[in-house]
Amino acid sequence: MIRLAGNSQDGIQTAGAFLARLAGRSEHDVMTYMTIPATISGGPSIFQVRIGSGEVLSAGDEADFLVAFYQHSYQDHIGFLREGGVLLYDSDNVEPNLDDKRFFYVGVPITGLTVEALGGTAKDKGKNIFVLGLIAKIFNLDAEKLKRVITEKFSGKDQSVVNTALMAFQAGYAYPVGNVLTKHYRFEHIPRASGRAQITMDGNQALAYGLIAGGVRYGAGYPITPWSSVMEVLRRELPKYGGIFVQAEDELASVSIALGCSYSGYLAVTGSAGPGISLKAEAIGWASMAEIPIIICNIQRGGPSTGLPTNVEQSDLHQAIFGSHGDSPRVVLAPASVEDCFYIAIEAARIARKYSTPVFILSDTSLATRIEAFDEPDLSKLMVDPKPDLTPRQTHKPYPIDQITHHVPPGTRILDGKYPLLAGLEHDEMGHPTGSPKLHMAMTAKRRNKLRKLAEEIPVSEIYGNQEGDTLLVGWGSTYGPIHDAVKMARDNGEKVGALHLRHLHPLPNGLEKIFDKFKRIVTVEMNDQGVYGFGQLATILRARYCEPKITSFTKTDGLTFRVKEILDGVFKGKSFLARHIPREGAEVIHQAGAENVKTLKEVVPQGVG
């Protein structure tokens, strides 16, 4: 695992993304993690890349290779470098404690050499690419392929920008780092089992393309971090499929536009982060009452209020399920990985159409911004081409008591001349407003029962690890990878533990109680607060649903993703585990005191670094 630590204006996210995309194109598995400040003025920032030829599920607990651009970068992140790791630092700005013999130190005057290489034309603005050249040399990366990635990134800019970036890269690549680092490393290429081409993208991109594959052609939104990049992809791509995405004047307008598109016969999407979802709440409640299909993406961030706009949290689960006045049924899904962002969008579109209901997709900042490589989807089997059914009907009831609502697009001929209405007021089967107590009870049950029917068709996720035993870890969203790595490590140390990951959060799949019966305790792992009653948001739902006192939770609210060590320490309090690194079959890193022991790192690391 490589961690770049500097300031947000240094372009370390760009450099890290280049590494990730190179890894994906080289058929390696990859996962990234980044933090950026919420202020316009910028501040400390990191970008880390974990690369391997095996399955990479989490971003990693400790770095094998740390790049420090500033003194604060060194001081804040040296604790994340594992013993025997390499510290590459800008000797123009950093003075490390060389008496600390746990690490190997490589000091390079990065700032000065960058300015010198670029002739002062861009000052030190190319030092991120200079460092990329250094890393490429140290890790024996494909320099020509990396240059192509750089060129593609800046292809829309003036040619001088491309040339400057390539000059900075070449200067870093040519630096005689071998004079101070005697061992170079390379990633062994292991063909992927699927044999299919890989694509590399972040979670928001995967979500946007999944929506398109699922047949979404229209949508509207309002910019907010971290949802905005979904909008950017949809605004660029939807016109290629005959659709359009509108940037509305506010959140209420955006959800209203999307609802109009859906009623016209084309399933539409809107989205935001927590604050924007609060503003959309009334219209989403209207969609529940009118039974209009719509997809609502909530890219969760730290809250409440403006909160932590660039940090991760899973604190909007209750908002998604209960965030409306009255009994307002809706479906809530959560992707587990970047790849799953693509497939969960297709699932959301299917459910919205079949059950004429609002469907929430709860992603989060970690999934939105991290880059992963995965097998290219077979669009020939997945792509949905939406075509509204304008076939004339003899008659049409939009709200039959004993059936699921399916609206006909406006303009469809109704031969008996009885055209239905669309109302947010309680209504009868034709949509006419009514205050009948009997009808309100019947319609409330109708809207509720379609979610019960959905629960019957949701498959229960498979348990990873022990199928029965002492502890079952239950997660949702981006906690998938760290939980699975924690379970593997715990089982390697003799614990009888399994993991269950939920993609369908509301309604829950039927049959979970049979799984819970097989374990002595159930612990949800969540990035939200334990609340007044001492349980995370998912744990609260599960305890209410199953009345099971053995359900507890391990939660945190620091705005950072879970580390494997955190989960192990939080769930198995008082127990120590022999391995503090994440087990990786075929990867052997020997750690001993003294910087000279970096020489014990294997030249060929079959499963990657970290």
Q: Where would I find each of the regions flagged by the language model?
A:
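Thiamine diphosphate
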Residues: 1-10, 15-17, 148, 152-322, ...
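A short helix->loop->beta-strand "cap" motif at the edges of active sites that frequently abuts
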Residues: 81-87, 101-103, 243, 266, ...
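Active-site cofactor/cluster-binding pocket
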Residues: 1-214, 218
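Flexible, low-complexity linker and terminal segments
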Residues: 200-204, 208-212, 344, 349-610
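Gly/Ser/Thr-rich loops at beta-strand to alpha-helix junctions
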Residues: 9-12, 128, 137-139, 223-228, ...
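Phosphate/diphosphate-binding loops
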Residues: 61-63, 69-73, 77, 81, ...
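Short, conserved loop/helix-junction motifs that constitute active-site signature segments
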Residues: 78-84, 98-100, 287-288, 376, ...
